[in-house]
Amino acid sequence: MQGSAKMAMAVAVAVARVWRPSRGLGRTGLPLLRLLGARGLARFHPHRWQQQQHFSSLDDKPQFPGASAEFIDKLEFIQPNVISGIPIYRVMDRQGQIINPSEDPHLPQEKVLKFYKSMTLLNTMDRILYESQRQGRISFYMTNYGEEGTHVGSAAALDDTDLVFGQYREAGVLMYRDYPLELFMAQCYGNVSDLGKGRQMPVHYGCRERHFVTISSPLATQIPQAVGAAYAAKRANANRVVICYFGEGAASEGDAHAGFNFAATLECPIIFFCRNNGYAISTPTSEQYRGDGIAARGPGYGILSIRVDGNDVFAVYNATKEARRRAVAENQPFLIEAMTYRIGHHSTSDDSSAYRSVDEVNYWDKQDHPISRLRHHLQSRGWWDDEQEKAWRKQSRKKVMEAFEQAERKLKPNPSLIFSDVYQEMPAQLRKQQESLARHLQTYGEHYPLDHFEK
């Protein structure tokens, strides 16, 4: 090994010694990391360095380090439209029948029923909270109509300790992990039971106990963050995977490129899960990209990729299960593109009738809904019937309404809490601001709805 390689190895070892998952890089580690640089860490692998030293002058094959390819003597550009589209993997047809028995996950009845109940409970919660926003009871909401299969199928394939980075339409992942309805409601109402203490707008859930990182609004910021978490898990030999959800619109953000490239070069155990639901707010996929969707981008980064039918909960489950197994065993990233359709409006601030037809929405709602497909499957196996359906619909609505009414009665957190949790110990400047707010409210309190807030 040459001197420069030895030096790089020494610096890498020094960084590894000072880095601990529990306390970060520390004062010594940060300067070392800056000295080495992210590119140096990413590209330096002793075994690769040794392999790249074998040059041959006996043939006329390309020796460029940037790609593995052959020379050609004809000028020819690669035409994107002559490359076949990546196929869509599915297990069930639209009537809920297994197409290829060898792909049947052979899940027990209890687990498949949990799939169905999680999906329908989410659907019921969506309807009630959407209407509550329309009535002015909460400020904002985003439904998950039509995408329930992507949430539940992927969540069921993960271990409970796998870390989840969501975008803002993955409530079903938390639902499957038995996140209480009361906490869903508390977050949307921003009341005293909200884990975030009322600081986030509705649907921005987070729960440390369920290993679900709090959602942030800016598009795609979670992608490089998730890669960093996966890299840390790899270094700590945590034997877990990180899954990062995003939409096809977020995949157009620069953070997606950065995340994909870092995950590939750092060989991180991460699953990139793209919900391609047809629209990024009002932008259709035909205006979002010109290539073959999102899965086609994976190979260009060196990421194993697959496209699945997102309305087939078993296809989503199988793909995520295998990606999880291999990501942990092989320390490499995977990209899953789940093809689905956003039946609801983008949010309560959107009217999708302005950019798509009612017939289009009705087709997906009536003809290819993930809940209907799974119900057909359950009924064909004798695991579900109309009476059970009727009873469960009534029971699930009652559960949601009870949590809803409980959340509505609770007070908002004390306004002074906006200054807490910023630092471990509140500095003098922040304490001064807190005291200033208290004086202001004491003087002008009659102008604020303080009766709705905890004292």
Curated annotation (Swiss-Prot):
Mark out the transit peptide: 1-55
The cofactors it requires, by name, are: thiamine diphosphate; Mg(2+)
Q: Which domain of life is it from?
A: Eukaryota
Entry keyword set? Acetylation, Magnesium, Metal-binding, Mitochondrion, Oxidoreductase, Phosphoprotein, Potassium, Thiamine pyrophosphate, Transit peptide
Keyword field contains Nucleotide-binding: no
Cystine pairs annotated here are: none
InterPro entries assigned to the protein according to its UniProt record, in alphabetical order: Alpha-ketoacid_DH_E1_comp, DH_E1, THDP-binding
Where along this sequence does the record place binding of thiamine diphosphate?
168-169, 217, 249-250, 275, 346
Q: What class of enzyme is it?
A: oxidoreductase
Q: Which residues carry this modification: N6-succinyllysine?
A: 366, 390
UniProt-recorded name of the protein: 2-oxoisovalerate dehydrogenase subunit alpha, mitochondrial
Oligomeric state and interaction partners are given as: Heterotetramer of 2 alpha/BCKDHA and 2 beta chains/BCKDHB that forms the branched-chain alpha-keto acid decarboxylase (E1) component of the BCKD complex. The branched-chain alpha-ketoacid dehydrogenase is a large complex composed of three major building blocks E1, E2 and E3. It is organized around E2, a 24-meric cubic core composed of DBT, to which are associated 6 to 12 copies of E1, and approximately 6 copies of the dehydrogenase E3, a DLD dimer. Interacts with PPM1K.
Family as reported in the entry's similarity comment: Belongs to the BCKDHA family.
SUPFAM superfamilies, A to Z: Thiamin diphosphate-binding fold (THDP-binding)
Role played = Together with BCKDHB forms the heterotetrameric E1 subunit of the mitochondrial branched-chain alpha-ketoacid dehydrogenase (BCKD) complex. The BCKD complex catalyzes the multi-step oxidative decarboxylation of alpha-ketoacids derived from the branched-chain amino-acids valine, leucine and isoleucine producing CO2 and acyl-CoA which is subsequently utilized to produce energy. The E1 subunit catalyzes the first step with the decarboxylation of the alpha-ketoacid forming an enzyme-product intermediate.
From what organism does this protein derive?
Bos taurus
